[in-house]
Regions:
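RNA-binding accessory domains that recognize and position tRNA/RNA substrates
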Residues: 2-243, 257, 368, 380-387
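Short clusters of small/polar residues that mark proteolytic maturation junctions
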Residues: 32-33, 70, 321, 352, ...
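Cysteine-nucleophile active-site neighborhood
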Residues: 242, 246-247, 252-318, 326, ...
Length: 387
């Protein structure tokens, strides 16, 4: 970069000043990129070192500002192959260093990708300090100011603007008690088939997937052995059972599982009639349907390096995770057996029904991004529905 180019870049950054105001009054300054519009949401941190496009397109991040702890973001751009859903549902992206794309797979820069999706971003933030703050004090409601418009009561002065933004963060309703699954689910049912198995479609088992925010790679894994019908989150148990499924899959999704009451009732009606497998939000909903309760974690689990112990085998799996709530250990009913635990904080990571064909895990065995240590769980589901 020439001196003139560097000076032009520096001047442009000065004109795009932005800040992230946390509800506890802490302010982080940076430079705006992506869509130039302000947002309010909950700040979380993700410890993954790569896979930012898969993270951005994970519907489980609806309503949240995602802080990436990796030092540099954007250098491999974005492409159509790494998309995990039909859109971006997160409220914003927070990074340390942003770089323009230089990769043969890239079709669009991250900056332009965020602009097209209407998602604001901020870079130049001390993400290490922000992550430590969230770790020590818990996830925070926040206001992200990236627009050119003045904010606050009179738009005068940086301090007044920041104080106004902090108050907006405090007044936001947050994720607790909110049903975001109904906001990210599909509008109508659709079918997913593996191209390699299409000739044998009629002989494959039929899996109905409840879409609470399902990721594309989950559907790919299911389609490796089944005909998959994806249905909206509020589809009744009666309608699902009329489809004569060999198994029902409960997908991942965002926000508070206790608020998704309609799904809990549907799961109760399905249990015992066909095998059930749940992931992430689906795990929490299955557990609630069986009598357990969920609660909020201090700063959640977000990343692709979380160690989980399989209690049956003693094996430790490195897993991809994305959740702010978890099943509370003291509420697990007699009918459920805990199968997996998190080695960082001993929270529940998996359960199995003792008498019915139903099991679930809190983490993401499909990876995307992340390791493949737990893909065997899809094979367990296949064996269960093919008995």
């Amino acid at each position: 970069m020439t001196t003139a180019e560097y000076q032009a870049k520096w001047q442009a950054e000065r004109e795009r000043k932005a800040f992230l105001a946390l509800a506890d009054g802490t302010i982080f300054h940076g430079v705006a990129f992506g869509a130039r519009k302000d947002k309010v949401g909950e700040v979380v941190f993700n410890t993954g070192m790569s896979g930012y496009q898969e993270i951005l397109t994970d519907p489980s991040y609806a309503g949240q500002f995602v802080t990436l702890t990796t030092a540099e973001v954007g250098n491999y751009g974005t492409n159509p192959e790494d998309i995990e859903s039909r859109g971006l549902f997160l409220h914003g992206l927070v990074v340390n260093a942003y770089d323009e794309a230089s990769n043969f797979r890239s079709t669009k820069s991250l900056d332009q990708y965020l602009k097209d999706a209407g998602v604001p971003g901020i870079y130049g933030v001390d993400t290490r300090a922000l992550t430590i703050h969230l770790r020590d004090h818990g996830n925070q409601r926040a206001y992200l100011h990236v627009s050119d418009e003045e904010i606050g009561a009179n738009g005068e002065g940086r301090k007044e603007n920041e104080e106004w933004a902090v108050e907006q963060a405090r007044q936001w309703e947050g994720l607790d008690g909110q049903d975001y699954a109904s906001k990210v689910t599909c509008e109508k049912e659709y079918h997913v088939d593996s191209s390699s198995l299409i000739a044998h479609r009629s002989s494959l088992p039929h899996v109905v997937c409840y879409d609470f925010g399902v990721k594309t790679n989950i559907l790919r894994n299911l389609a490796e052995f089944a005909r998959v019908t994806v249905v909206p989150a509020k589809t009744t148990a009666e309608a699902v059972l009329k489809m004569k499924p060999d198994g029902v899959f409960l997908s991942n999704g965002p926000a508070d599982p206790a608020a998704v009451t309609y799904a809990q009732e549907n799961i109760k009606m399905i249990l015992g009639k066909v095998p059930v497998f749940g992931i992430c939000l689906g795990h929490q909903l299955l557990s609630i349907a069986c009598g357990a309760k969920t609660g909020r974690l201090k700063f959640g689990h977000h990343g692709c390096n979380h160690p989980v112990k399989n209690l049956a085998t003693g094996a430790v799996e490195i897993t991809s995770q994305n959740h702010n709530f978890a099943v509370m250990d003291e509420t697990v009913p007699e009918c459920l057996e805990v199968t997996h635990v998190n080695l960082n904080d001993n929270t529940i990571e998996g359960v199995r029904h003792k008498t019915l064909p139903a099991f679930s895990v809190q983490y993401h065995p499909e990876s995307a991004p992340g390791p493949h240590d737990s893909k065997y769980l899809f094979d367990e589901f296949r064996k269960m529905i093919c008995k």
